[in-house]
Amino acid sequence: MFYGEYQHTIDPKGRAIVPSKFREGLGEKFILTKGLDGCLFAYSSEEWTSLENKLKSLPFTDKDVRAFIRFFFSGATECEVDKQGRILIPQNLREYAALEKDTYIIGVSSRVEIWDKTAWEAYNSDENISADKIAEKMALLGI
């Protein structure tokens, strides 16, 4: 389980430090891919395999399923943590998430998300994503 929020920077070579608590759960090698809301998602190999199996069980004939699978898997890459606890974020993923220097690395249950600092702060200030509104929606779902 991943939780918490950490600020880090990406160096000029595109490397970012993965917080030690997240490295423990992700492992030395993990999958990084395009996420939703303009961020990147990181999954442990085990979680990725589980997610892959769930997605493979969806009806391939559904256009939206195919589109999501293409989006999700075409951006995926295996990352390896170096001795300094860093990963190299590929250029295409840095461009997708508009990652330049300042980032937030956050834990979200079964995955880690990497956000551009400005995008994360804008997301958190969005009135449609207030804690009260989210709580109301969760209550409707029985949570």
From Swiss-Prot:
S-S pairs: none
- Give GO MF terms, alphabetically: DNA-binding transcription factor activity; transcription cis-regulatory region binding
User: What are the annotated GO cellular component locations?
Assistant: cytoplasm; nucleoid
User: Which residue intervals define the domain SpoVT-AbrB in the entry?
Assistant: 5-47, 76-119
What are the transmembrane regions? none
GO terms under biological process:
negative regulation of DNA-templated transcription initiation
Q: Which domain of life is it from?
A: Bacteria
Identify the keywords attached in UniProt to this record, alphabetized. Answer: Cytoplasm, DNA-binding, Repeat, Transcription, Transcription regulation
What's the subunit arrangement here? Forms oligomers.
The protein's name is: Transcriptional regulator MraZ
- Native organism: Ruminiclostridium cellulolyticum (strain ATCC 35319 / DSM 5812 / JCM 6584 / H10) (Clostridium cellulolyticum)
Gene name, per UniProt, is mraZ
